[in-house]
């Protein structure tokens, strides 16, 4: 059985305290390669232990965090934030798994996350559905066909393979302030 996209609802025991702690941090990391703003600081300690223990139980192995990426950092995407389809772990030496934890109560459900078919898979998809691959790539934003997706639900963790094409789903961000924005925490890791 392949496990490539996993959704866990009610992930944290106390998401409100994690959210409160996250909102007290500075969202001071702006990068061209990352939508919105991230914290340069992380929350670890007891929070890291809880996350690690639960992911270990779900995936059945030791968790090795990829600290070269934004593990345990928080990200805010407000209304109007531009996003794009990308791979969270494009390099060979980066973590095999990625995770997004949604931390906004009563969010826009369409601001979840989605994984997309590669160009090669899109070609096969178009053929299988009786569409012309040559014209369908333009119609589907250069071949952007969602393979798997999950809506934004408070305290939902979505785990997926970091080497697949990923994008915040239909709505990239929402809210006009940090408190009302699409607040997430990201994780990057391997399982041994």
What are these regions (language model features)?
Residues 1-85, 112:
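Non-heme Fe(II)/2-oxoglutarate
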Residues 79-192:
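Catalytic core of non-heme Fe(II) oxygenases with the double-stranded beta-helix
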């Amino acid at each position: 059985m392949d496990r490539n996209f996993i959704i866990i609802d009610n992930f944290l025991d106390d998401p409100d305290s994690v959210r409160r702690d996250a909102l007290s941090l500075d969202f001071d990391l702006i990068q061209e390669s990352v939508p919105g703003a991230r914290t340069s600081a992380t929350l670890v300690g007891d929070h890291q232990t809880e996350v690690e223990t639960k992911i270990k139980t779900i995936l059945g192995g030791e968790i090795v965090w990829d600290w070269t990426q934004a593990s345990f950092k928080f990200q805010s995407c407000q209304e109007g934030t531009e996003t794009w389809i990308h791979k969270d772990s494009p390099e060979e030496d980066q973590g095999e798994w990625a995770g997004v934890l949604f931390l906004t109560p009563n969010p826009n459900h369409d601001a979840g996350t989605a994984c997309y078919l590669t160009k090669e898979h899109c070609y096969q998809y178009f053929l299988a559905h009786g569409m012309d691959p040559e014209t369908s790539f333009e119609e589907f934003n250069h071949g952007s066909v969602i393979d798997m997706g999950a809506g934004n639900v408070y305290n939902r963790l979505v785990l997926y393979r970091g080497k697949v094409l990923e994008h915040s789903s239909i709505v990239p961000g929402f809210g006009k302030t940090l408190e009302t924005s699409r607040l997430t925490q990201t994780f990057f890791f391997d399982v041994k």
